[in-house]
Design a protein with these regions (language model features):
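N-terminal secretory signal peptides and thylakoid transit peptides that target proteins
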Residues: 1-22
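C-terminal segment of N-terminal export signals and the immediately downstream linker at the start
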Residues: 25-63, 73-77, 81-84
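Extended active-site neighborhood of metal-dependent phosphoesterases/phosphodiesterases
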Residues: 44-47, 111-180, 187-189
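Beta-strand-turn-beta hairpins that frame and shape the catalytic cleft
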Residues: 50-62, 158-169, 250-256
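Active-site-proximal beta-strand elements of phosphoester/diester hydrolases
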Residues: 59-69, 166-174, 196-199, 256-262
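Membrane-embedded segments
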Residues: 60-141, 148
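Active-site neighborhood of phospho(di)ester-bond hydrolases with catalytic His/Asp-centered motifs
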Residues: 65-66, 94-98, 125-131, 153-155, ...
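Conserved beta-sheet core of the metallophosphoesterase superfamily
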Residues: 202-282, 287
Length: 288
């Protein structure tokens, strides 16, 4: 009986210790996610080769950022630091894939213009709108981006020429609140042009795959924002569930979609095992 009491006492002590340790670990993880990881931006370099990629564009650096969600949980001061980091990547082309603001933005919309205007890219700055932008005031968000030097693409394309090669930057309308029309966006694009598509929601890739799009850049999902080891993200939004994070290839095709983890947060100001990200794409022509 005495040994049984000792075993029970030992079990209770160990159980209490385990519960306390878990609570402490959860608290530490929460603090890390709120005050640490969500500001610890990772620069990811992705190298890809394509038969259709023009040799004259080799060495061009395409830099993507997404989902800044400027507002309650992401300040203009923090956005200034993002711009500094983007510029250090020496971009030739800058692509923003939507959700500039997180909530009603008031006068902060004008204050962000000089910050975004500091971004320099010799071949252009391009953007599409996200679902948060569409829900609030898409015309105003578009105006902010355009006054900051971005070309906002809505079912349309822009051609970039270098040497004897040409690259088409195509932007699709937002899927949840807009009217995406890929055939319209590709109108005038020649069959041998390399096509870089900006689409806020990554699951648009299923449509892109059946077209002449070569590389789709997306955001929206934040990579899940909170990712549990050995499990993955605990939540991904509508149209961000099939291709929620990183690079995805498709059998029998050179087409890829890359889902950027974004800069800011939404719903809760926390990231765990899912650092904010900017992505640098270095593409090259695939030899026969």
């Amino acid at each position: 009986v005495k040994n049984d009491r000792i075993n029970r006492r030992t079990f209770l002590k160990k159980s209490l210790f385990a519960v306390e340790s878990l609570a402490i670990l959860t608290g530490v993880s929460g603090l890390y996610g709120i005050f640490g990881e969500r500001f610890w931006i990772q620069s990811t370099t992705v190298r890809l080769s394509y038969r259709r990629y023009p040799a004259s564009f080799e060495g061009v650096r395409i830099v993507q950022f997404s989902d800044t969600h400027i507002g309650k949980y992401y300040s203009l001061e923090q956005m200034n630091k993002v711009v500094d980091l983007l510029q250090r990547q020496e971009p030739d082309i800058i692509c923003f894939t939507g959700d500039l603001f997180d909530s009603k933005f008031g006068e902060v919309s004008d204050e962000v213009i000089p910050i975004l205007s500091r971004l320099r890219a010799g071949m252009g700055k391009f953007a599409v709108l996200g679902n948060h932008d569409m829900r609030m005031d898409s015309d105003r968000v578009r105006d902010v981006l355009e006054r900051s030097g971005f070309t906002v693409l809505v079912n349309e394309s822009r051609s970039i020429e270098r040497g004897n090669g040409r690259l088409q930057v195509v932007g699709i309308d937002e899927m949840l609140h807009g009217k995406p029309d890929l055939p319209l966006a590709l109108k005038g694009v020649k069959r041998d042009d390399f096509v870089l598509l900006l689409a806020h929601e990554p699951d648009f890739a299923d449509t892109s795959l059946a077209s002449q799009v070569d590389l789709q850049l997306s955001g929206h999902s934040h990579g899940g924002q909170i990712r549990i080891p050995l499990y993955g993200s605990i939540f991904t939004p509508e149209l961000g569930q099939k291709y929620p994070i990183g690079l995805h290839a498709f059998e029998g095709s050179e087409f890829h979609v890359y889902t950027n983890r974004g800069i800011g947060t939404t719903l809760f100001p926390i990231r765990f095992n899912c650092r904010p990200e900017i992505t640098v794409f270095v593409l090259e022509k695939k030899l026969p």
